[in-house]
């Protein structure tokens, strides 16, 4: 009958389209993903050129770090790609981690909304659906949480998406990478995507600068505010008038310096370069080995050792001006009673 042949024809077309969506995340996102616009409600996700390039980079690389201006649609394209990955890759685990749990859950909520508005033939059966996680019939799971080490420790993940990573406190960011990174690097296809607007010189800054200098495996992606349609010099002047030049430089020019108040002026910090230690072990970084005839000085600062503030000391070579940092130590777990022993061990080497 013609009705039966119509059904067959439709099913065949849907199968071909399903295959195309599976192979081409950009086609899937631009054709089927819906987003909520403040002005127009639910609309198709029309991507900017830089967003298309970013999806290609995510898809073809394992490690990506993105330095993006505010309101550049960064979260939308990320969750669109994660939705594609979960639908077309069975039994994968995906973690959406943000500086606040509420932000991560909001991102998962947007992903769930996009899923609900997909055509039925693109959807999977849903095994569980709540504010903090989603599990599909193909065995793929998505977890939303804050970027604390306990959130994903012990689990194995195929994609870890770190949103606004520069706003995660330094001690949490470092703990996260030391405890979670081994589970990431053990997989051959695991992807890590770090996305943020800069916020001072912290772990995001270090990973970004190392990526630019090709000292790590991350592909750095930078987007200038002028690449977002509708943003021109007039918009820039208006934004600065409504906020401040410093805020604009941080949130839209994506400058690391000046994004938080620092004791040393931004211009001085900008002249300083990051040095790779010749040796690192248990919180101690060594930049230069001791020279017998030289004079050394140690400055120390103690904390409680409760995983918040760091106990730290710096070893300076003060033989001649300018003084040089030759070693540094920092640890937020070492107890105040043990800290002097650690200082003494290093002091003996540099005498």
State each model region's role.
Residues 12-67:
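Conserved pre-motif I regulatory segment
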Residues 92-111:
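Conserved Walker A/P-loop ATP-binding site and its immediately adjacent core
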Residues 108-158:
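Inter-Walker segment of RecA-like/P-loop motor cores
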